[in-house]
Amino acid sequence: MLGVRRALLLPPLQLALLVAAGTGARVSAPRSLAWGPGLHADAVLPVRYFFLQSVDSDGRNFTSSPPGQTQFKVVVKSLSPKELVRIYVPKPLDRNDGTFLVRYRMHETVHEGLKIEILYGGEHVAQSPYILKGPVYHEYCDCPEDDPQAWQKTLSCPANEPQIEQDFISFPSINLQQMLKEVPKRFGDERGAIVHYTILNNHIYRRSLGKYTDFKMFSDEILLSLARKVTLPDLEFYINLGDWPLEHRKVNDTPGPIPIISWCGSLDSRDIILPTYDVTHSTLEAMRGVTNDLLSVQGNTGPSWINKTEKAFFRGRDSREERLQLVLLSKENPQLLDAGITGYFFFQEKEKELGKAKLMGFFDFFKYKYQVNVDGTVAAYRYPYLMLGDSLVLKQESPYYEHFYVELRPWKHYVPIKRNLSDLLEKVKWAKENDEEAKRIAKEGQLTARDLLQPPRLYCYYYRVLQKYAERQVSKPMIRDGMERVPQPDDSTSVRQCHRKRPEREEL
């Protein structure tokens, strides 16, 4: 049964009607529901999306895929026949719980607006057709909203993020001059992976500190994407592109900690955490450069629970010794665990003993009922995607965390396993013997992950971190020597079609 507290996932008027439709029921197009950011012109995202809830003629929600061959059909087109635009609309993703996820990616801006038709068996669904009055901007249109509060309201940003509040407790004020002196000395050596950013007048500037800064392409792309959507505060900060969090000083130390921004946190560090480059890149490149993203995984969760293989499953690199232990456990207990290493780098001498497993498509992981999540060098960045599936996640206890872990609870959203994996087999046996409880935890984890990992929420999180940081600066951010401007991708239509900008006049 779907939870009733997730307003972004279920339309409010339907919250009282969560009664499963009968097995012989048919979908009623008029009574079915459509909602989500993709039905609103102002909610600019790389991939726009919305949800469908299949409902029968008695007003009861389907809680599994509707029977029969009829499918939802969605057409997204320009309101004006004079505007010829490319819009990619794949077929709706069946989330196997009676809901569907509809995605579309715009490749040009539409000035007049969009018309979205949602059909089932030739009938319009809910309030279809939906009219999105123009302009409707595509991802690369540089047209930021000047009112951050209005932008946050459009995306339904949460009032607060617990991890952000926790991270900034250590930094009631931020001394840029102190950081300018300390960061290059402490973290900017030959092995460093630090990028120094300044955002000024919504333009982004940076300089690299250290040798290993190629991953700045990932921090660049999400900052540029954010700046195209909303006017950012002026600020100056350092992003750590490496795996491990850097600042280990305690609040009471002298000198105290400095606010380094990282993608992964740990219990013994003070870094400020942002969503990982993996989830932001997959969000930016969804339906274009990547196939596994926070949306696509929701429609590729494998067989239904009852038809999944009753084993725990793992595939991955050898980036932590416990992963090798998984393979040994698997060899000794093949009836409970299927684990394999797909690539050796850290423990190459073990390949002959443990063998090398063939690569598998990520979506095939969900053929198995239980997923083992073990750290890599730090937190395993597959974890968000595993949580969005409908398998039960067995998560290794870890000092490392991503931005959303603070919202998850053991035995409610996942089953914990000890750091040394000594209780893994015991937990697999428990899950097999308590199938309904295991299924309930898996479902609760999936629904919570759907809420926490929506693409708009990532943008909200990024903006809130930058905003909190900017509020605490005690001196004015500046463009420093050696910084270069990071240009927006070229889009000749941006200025012409952005209603918030006037074309720049050419100098005579």
From Swiss-Prot:
SMART domains, sorted: CAP10, IG_FLMN
Pfam families named among the record's database cross-references: Filamin (PF00630), Glyco_transf_90 (PF05686)
InterPro entries found in the cross-reference section: CAP10 (IPR006598), Filamin/ABP280_repeat-like (IPR017868), Filamin/ABP280_rpt (IPR001298), Ig-like_fold (IPR013783), Ig_E-set (IPR014756), O-Glucosyltr/Glycosyltrsf_90 (IPR051091)
Keywords: Endoplasmic reticulum, Glycoprotein, Glycosyltransferase, Signal, Transferase
Role summary: Protein glucosyltransferase that catalyzes the transfer of glucose from UDP-glucose to a serine residue within the consensus sequence peptide C-X-N-T-X-G-S-F-X-C. Can also catalyze the transfer of xylose from UDP-xylose but less efficiently. Specifically targets extracellular EGF repeats of proteins such as NOTCH1, NOTCH3, FBN1, FBN2 and LTBP1. May regulate the transport of NOTCH1 and NOTCH3 to the plasma membrane and thereby the Notch signaling pathway.
Protein name: Protein O-glucosyltransferase 3
Single Gene Ontology MF annotation: EGF-domain serine xylosyltransferase activity
Filamin repeat positions: 25-134
Record localization: Endoplasmic reticulum lumen
Region (Disordered), start-end ranges: 480-508
Domain of life of the source: Eukaryota
Family: Belongs to the KDELC family.
Residues spanned by motif Prevents secretion from ER: 505-508
Signal sequence bounds: 1-24
Species name: Rattus norvegicus
Pathway listed: Protein modification; protein glycosylation
Glycosylation sites: 307
Protein's GO biological process: protein O-linked glycosylation via serine
Reaction(s) this enzyme catalyzes, per UniProt: L-seryl-[EGF-like domain protein] + UDP-alpha-D-glucose = 3-O-(beta-D-glucosyl)-L-seryl-[EGF-like domain protein] + UDP + H(+); L-seryl-[EGF-like domain protein] + UDP-alpha-D-xylose = 3-O-(beta-D-xylosyl)-L-seryl-[EGF-like domain protein] + UDP + H(+)
GO cellular component, one term: endomembrane system
Entry's EC annotation: 2.4.1.-, 2.4.2.-
